[in-house]
Amino acid sequence: MSRSDPILIVGGGLGGLTTALALAQHGRPARVLEGALQFGAIGYGIQFGPNVFHVFDRLGLSEQVLAIADLPVGVVMMDALTGKELIRVPTGPSFCARFKYPYIVVHRIDVHNVLLDACRRNGAVELVSDARDEI
C-alpha cells in the first residue's frame, strides 16, 4: 500500500468523518464508505468535554463548532430513583482555564454537518454513499 492509496473508512458518522479529516491533515487520502443513500445523521443532543473539543481544535473546526454549541454553566448528576443531587461540576471560565477547552452541548446533526462540509472541502477525502456493495 503506497501513501497515495486511500485509507478506507467504513461509516460516515462522526467517527468516520473525523478520522478522514485527521488522515487528510497528515497527508493520507481517505475514502469514506457510507451505506446510506446520502450522508446524513440522526439527531439528538450530545455533550462533548474538553478532550473531544481538543480534536475539533486540531482539525481546525473549533470556531465552527463553538458557533453551533451551547456552553452550559455546569453539569449536575442526579440519582434517577431519588432525585438527589450526586455531584455538581461548574463548567464556566475556571473549567475552561483548567482544561484549556470548553464543555459543550450541541445537536449531533449540526456537528455532523460541520465535519461533512470540512470533508467535502478537503481534496484528500472522498465520500462514497450507497456503498453497501462497493467493498
Where in this protein do the model-derived segments appear?
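N-terminal Rossmann-fold NAD(P) dinucleotide-binding loop
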Residues: G16-L17
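Glycine-rich FAD pyrophosphate-binding loop
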Residues: L8, A24-Y44
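Conserved N-terminal glycine-rich FAD pyrophosphate-binding loop of Rossmann-like flavoproteins
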Residues: L37-D57
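Glycine-rich NAD(P) Rossmann-fold beta1-alpha1 loop
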Residues: G13
